[in-house]
Amino acid sequence: MNRPIVIAAGGTGGHFFPAEAVATVLAERGHDLVLMTDARHGRRETGLFKDRPQYVLDGAGVAGKGLSGKVHGVLALLRGMMEARRILASLDAAAVVGFGGYPSIPPLTASRLLPSAKRPQMVIHEGNAVLGQANAFLSRFSPLIATSYAKVARLPENARTTLTGMPVREGIEALFGHVYAPPEDRINLLVWGGSLGARVFSEIVPQALAALSEDFRKRLKVTQQIKADDLERVRAIYENAGIEVEAAPFFTNVPACLKNAHLVIGRAGGSSVAELAMAGLPSILVPLPIAASDEQGANGQALVDAGAAWMIRQPDFTAAALTALLTDLFSHPEKLENAAKAAHLCARPHAAAKVADLIESALRS
C-alpha cells in the first residue's frame, strides 16, 4: 500500500473545491488519499472523497468571537491538533497538503510534531492575493507554497513559492478558450454570492435592475443565487419589473451558468475570481467587507488592473450606483467584450495539475 497523501481543507467551497480539484489529479495518478476537514461541506459525502478515508477533526473550523470564543477556539484547535497527530502517525502519511482555513491548521501543525523519520512533506496552497491567516501561521514551518497570484502580500521573505494558479472544478476548466459573444438582443446576467449567496445582492441588485430602462428590462435574463428566505420577495420584485429570472439558493450547473453569462456580479473570493478568468467573463465585483486583510479586495483589484472587471466597495454598492454602471455597460457592449478578453488573459489553466506536480516533487525530495 502506498503512503497516503492527506488533503486538509476547510468545508467552505472556496477551500474545498480547489482541494478536490487537486485530489482528483492525484487520484488519477494513482495516489492514495485521505481527507481531513470539518463538518461544513456536504460534498465530502458525495464527491471524490465519498469512498475514501475521512477524518472530521475536533475543533476544526472554530475561530471564535470575543475573548471567551477565542479561548474556546484555541482549545478546540489544540484538541484537533492532538487528534490529527495520532491519526497521521497511524497513517504514515507521505505528505500533508493544506488549502487554507482554520481546519488546515491542526493536521499541518501536527505533522511537524511527528518524529523526523515519520514526518510527511508539507505543502500549502494560497488562493488569494494576500496570504490568509491560517497559511500565514503555517508558513513558519517553511512549507512549499503554491500561489494563485504572481504577487502575494504577507509572504515571508524566505518563502519557497511556486506560481500554480487556483485549481478550479473540471467543468469550469473546460470553459478556458470559450469565445465570448457580447450581448446583442438577450442579456444574460449571472449574480452569485459565494457558497450560499449574499443578502446584499438580494437587496441591491433587484432594485438596480428594476430601475433600468424598459428596453433593458425586457432583454434581461437574470440567474441569481439567493438565500431561501429571500426567494419569494426577490422574485416578486423581478416579476413586477417585467424581468425574467431564475433564482435558487444554490446552482449545481455552474459551468453552464458561466458559459451563458454576458456579465457576472459577485464577490471576489479566490475561487470566484479564478473561475471568472477561466471562463473569460467580465464582472462587477463587490469584495466581502469583513474578509481578513481585505484579501477579496486584493483579488478583485488584480482583475480591475487588467481591465477585466469593475469593483464597487460594499459601502458604495447602492442601487443607483449599480443602475448607472449597468446602463453604461449594456449601452456599450464593446466594453464587456474588451473586459472578457482581458479576463481570459488572467486565467491560469491546469492549476490543479501544477499543484499536483509540486506535491510529487516534494515526495521525490
From Swiss-Prot:
Gene3D superfamilies, alphabetized: Glycogen Phosphorylase B (3.40.50.2000)
Entry keyword set: Cell cycle, Cell division, Cell inner membrane, Cell membrane, Cell shape, Cell wall biogenesis/degradation, Glycosyltransferase, Membrane, Peptidoglycan synthesis, Transferase
Reaction catalysed by this enzyme: di-trans,octa-cis-undecaprenyl diphospho-N-acetyl-alpha-D-muramoyl-L-alanyl-D-glutamyl-meso-2,6-diaminopimeloyl-D-alanyl-D-alanine + UDP-N-acetyl-alpha-D-glucosamine = di-trans,octa-cis-undecaprenyl diphospho-[N-acetyl-alpha-D-glucosaminyl-(1->4)]-N-acetyl-alpha-D-muramoyl-L-alanyl-D-glutamyl-meso-2,6-diaminopimeloyl-D-alanyl-D-alanine + UDP + H(+)
Pathway connected to this protein: Cell wall biogenesis; peptidoglycan biosynthesis
Enzyme class label: transferase
Gene Ontology biological process terms in this record: carbohydrate metabolic process; cell division; cell wall organization; lipid glycosylation; peptidoglycan biosynthetic process; regulation of cell shape
GO cellular component, one term: plasma membrane
Transmembrane stretches, start-end: none
Primary subcellular site in the record, as a coarse category: membrane
Protein name, UniProt field: UDP-N-acetylglucosamine--N-acetylmuramyl-(pentapeptide) pyrophosphoryl-undecaprenol N-acetylglucosamine transferase
Taxonomic placement: Bacteria, Pseudomonadati, Pseudomonadota, Alphaproteobacteria, Acetobacterales
Gene expressing this chain: murG
